[in-house]
């Protein structure tokens, strides 16, 4: 009798859980296929426009807005001079560069002083957003390019990247600012392309684009001149992941006006709107709107997501008819970590930051005034990004345990049809999503007169590179996904325990990739 009761209970549990886990994987991959379908046409249009638009018209236009490039720097003594040198030679008619030394403990400030002949000065500092104490301000005395109005260096007490960005915003004299990482590489056309979007649609308060992986590319004079595959397998898996996330994920969400993240590596913002929304979130920000939305002395380890979600909320609460946009082709290149410990730190921080952003703005869920953000984008992130790791792991454990019970104890809980459907939904369909994402990113679209020219989003030089990447797209669900699942779960556990902090990881530096871009 006891055995029969155990069998009955186990069978009942199986009947309840089977459709739950199968439904989750079907829903997730269906969601991704929807974004791929939405993004494919957008990518084709943008690829064609990317190569036929005459962006030089921006140079002579009275409507071209000046920009401020805000560069937070913490212990960047090795790369900061090269990074700033590349920035001041960017192709844009009018801009200034503000480097914020966030209390570096190395020689970052001194190498900047020597390279750009910095002179201490008392420049206007608008204390619009609360920050850590600014110790000194410097301006460059070297001869700058004609289109660069000034190069400013702020030396402040250490308080994190978000606080450094706020200090840069306070110093900015332009209506728009660019947030970027000190170790990123900008595409030569990036600034003009993003500001062209702002000119065409004045409703845009923030715009970003795809961040591509620089590992394996050939870099010359601070520019990516040839796209290749990284030599390390972890970086190749990340390339598949970035294509799925940026090329299809965010491009598809952009079609729905529902982009929730613009990468902190590179994005353009309307300054006054960001100031009115309270700036980047730190415990030092004392702003009525920030306190209303997230509480007093709140902070986050993923400022790039939180500021975008808060801007969506602020725009729909106060401004209406404004939007946040995304470009599918690469506007910046960044080095991704190749060591597992560095990847663990990065993914754990991302998961903690995701939780913070979602919980801070949970009042937006299913509220009519927030439109697709409240009814589609945020619920999707809650289900697939926040609860997803838990549901995924539980689903795998469920199948494994019940298969063991059936094999060892002869308790028929799982039927063969369900097991096949589960594997197809979780692994087979997931692999198909990866393959589609790579094809959208690497496919050569025709453009120009009579469609004679061909170009892809990521212009790989060899077809072999694309085939190798497709192989990694197939393998991703079997090797890479289980590791990221573990890191995401660990990140959630750290968040529940109240862990904070960036856990900054060491980078190899672009020197490894200069003139050595290996294709395989």
Identify what each model region corresponds to:
Residues 47-370, 383-386, 499, 514-520:
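Non-transmembrane catalytic domains and loops of membrane-associated enzymes and transporters
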Residues 1-63, 250, 431-438, 484-500, ...:
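N-terminal membrane-anchoring/stem segments of glycan-assembly enzymes
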Residues 9-16, 48, 447-464, 468-472, ...:
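Hydrophobic helical membrane-anchoring modules
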Residues 342, 346-359, 468-517:
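Membrane-proximal soluble regions of multi-pass membrane proteins
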Residues 39, 380-496:
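Membrane-embedded multi-pass helical conduit in multi-pass membrane proteins
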């Amino acid at each position: 009798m006891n055995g029969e009761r155990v069998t009955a209970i186990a069978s009942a549990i199986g009947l309840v859980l089977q459709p739950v886990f199968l439904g989750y994987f079907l829903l997730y991959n269906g969601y991704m296929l929807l974004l791929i379908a939405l993004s494919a046409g957008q990518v084709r249009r943008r690829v064609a426009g990317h190569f036929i638009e005459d962006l030089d018209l921006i140079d002579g236009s009275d409507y071209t807005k000046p920009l401020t490039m805000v560069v937070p720097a913490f212990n960047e003594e090795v790369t900061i001079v090269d990074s700033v040198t590349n920035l001041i030679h960017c192709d844009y008619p009018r801009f200034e560069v503000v480097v914020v030394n966030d209390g570096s403990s190395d020689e970052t400030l001194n190498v900047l002083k020597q390279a750009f002949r910095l002179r201490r000065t008392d420049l206007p500092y608008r204390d619009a957003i609360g920050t850590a104490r600014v110790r000194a301000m410097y301006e460059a005395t070297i001869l700058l390019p004609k289109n660069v109005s000034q190069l400013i260096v702020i030396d402040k007490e250490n308080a994190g990247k978000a606080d450094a960005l706020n200090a840069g915003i306070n110093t900015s004299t332009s209506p728009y600012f660019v947030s970027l990482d000190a170790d990123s590489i900008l595409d030569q056309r990036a600034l003009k392309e993003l500001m062209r979007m702002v000119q065409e649609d004045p409703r845009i308060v923030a715009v970003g684009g795809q961040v591509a992986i620089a590992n394996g590319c050939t870099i010359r004079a601070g520019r990516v001149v040839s796209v290749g595959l990284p030599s390390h397998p972890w970086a190749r898996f990340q390339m598949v992941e970035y294509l799925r996330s940026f090329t299809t994920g965010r491009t598809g969400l952009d079609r729905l006006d529902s982009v929730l993240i613009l990468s902190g590596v590179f994005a353009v913002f309307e300054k006054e709107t960001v100031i009115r929304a309270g700036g980047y979130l730190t415990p030092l920000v004392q702003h009525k709107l920030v306190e209303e939305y997230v509480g007093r002395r709140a902070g986050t380890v993923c400022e790039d997501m939180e500021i975008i979600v808060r801007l969506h909320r602020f725009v729909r609460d106060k401004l209406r008819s404004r939007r946040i946009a995304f470009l599918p082709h690469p506007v910046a290149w960044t080095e991704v970590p190749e060591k597992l410990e560095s990847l663990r730190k990065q993914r754990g921080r991302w998961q903690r930051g995701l939780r913070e952003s979602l919980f801070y703005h949970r009042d937006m869920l299913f509220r009519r005034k927030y439109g697709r953000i409240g009814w589609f984008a945020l619920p999707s992130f809650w289900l697939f990004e926040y609860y997803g790791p838990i549901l995924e792991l539980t689903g795998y454990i469920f199948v494994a345990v019940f298969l063991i019970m059936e094999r060892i104890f002869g308790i028929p809980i799982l039927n063969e049809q369900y097991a096949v459907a589960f594997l197809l939904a979780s692994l087979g369909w997931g692999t198909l999503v990866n393959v589609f994402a790579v094809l959208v990113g690497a496919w050569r679209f025709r453009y120009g007169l009579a469609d004679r020219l061909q170009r892809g989003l990521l212009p790989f030089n060899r077809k072999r590179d694309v085939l190798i990447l497709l192989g990694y797209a197939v393998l991703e669900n079997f090797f890479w996904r289980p590791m990221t699942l573990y890191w995401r779960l660990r990140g959630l556990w750290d968040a529940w325990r109240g862990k904070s902090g960036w856990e900054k990881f060491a980078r190899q530096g672009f020197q490894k990739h200069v003139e050595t871009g290996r294709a395989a």
